Amino acid sequence: MDELNILELIEEKKYLQLKRILEEMNEVDIAEILDDLDLHTALLIFRMLPKDLAVEVFAHFSIEQQRDLVNAMTDKELNFILDELFFDDMIDLLEEMPANIVNKILMQSSSEERKLINQFLKYPPDSAGSIMTIEYVELKKTMTVREAMAHIKETGLSKETVYTCYVTDRNRKLEGIISLRILVVSDENALIEDLMEDEVIFVETHDDQETVAAVFVRYGFLAVPVVDKEHRLTGIITVDDIMDVMEQEATEDFQRMAAMAPSEEPYMDSGVFALAKQRIVWLLILMIAATFTGHIITSFENVLGSVVILTSFIPMLMNTGGSSGSQASTLVIRGLATGEIELKDVFKVIWKEFRISLLVGITLAIVNFGRLMSIEKVEIHIALTVSLT
């Protein structure tokens, strides 16, 4: 079902048929279609959705669509959405909304929720605390497997994940973790204390999100606990949230490799002046660097004038040099981004790149010398000069 078919059903007022079709679709696909519609049509279709599906669709809307819908919703509709949204999705929503919409949302929240929201909004934007959720399954080590399973069945539907459960003491200090798989296959009378893993890998609330992403990549976790400085469990970060972080970091890496200032805004949502500002600084630097190159070439004007054929090889030499530089910088920047290369490795990298460039340079020189002698038919001293350059 695409946007045109949906608009056709709306024009023909076949609302029941449209509702049945939407109920069978994935929430991500519905959100993508509604994002492209005008507000009136999107709101009409959104109100057709079953309540549970509507909440899931809302979580996948673009920030602009979420803002417009919140403005258009009744207080009752907004209250339901906020009650059903996972807490981390609500925080993401609030961080992107203007003050008037934030105030409208806070008015619909309980005093306890407002306290939690204010606490989350105080975390630095790129920290673990800013992307964690408080919806996790919490167990005590004195519980039996039977009691733990009953607790999961009672509270699991409102949690972000139940695959990993977190064991805390009465002060909420993290003591261990246990997977649902272990609970399912263990004896019902066994104690959580005897089954849990007490060597827990965790991150702290103020850790950078790149550090958190590295933990997920290294250990292949579905979720990672987040603790404060007193080792109290404050939340968890799930793999779906860290995937967004990885995508953002990868985008920034590509922008840096292309000599652009990183941008948090998607390309289609960025203004012309903002994009120009990101590019102009590095382009000016490259232009000035090219000016120095021009002066160097000018200083050899007499040589080039006496051996004019050398001029025709300048583009080849510059393009080859530029390409080799791009290859090296791409690999090194990617290594820095993934944590494979660290600052202490700078001399190792320089030594390795020197040996690589020496090997590649010799190979190119031999091939180029043969090409110039056999195809271009130039004199041997010119072939040697160009090849060694």
Predicted feature descriptions by range:
Residues 1-261:
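Hydrophobic packing positions in regular secondary-structure scaffolds
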Residues 142, 250-389:
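Alpha-helical transmembrane segments and their membrane-interface boundaries
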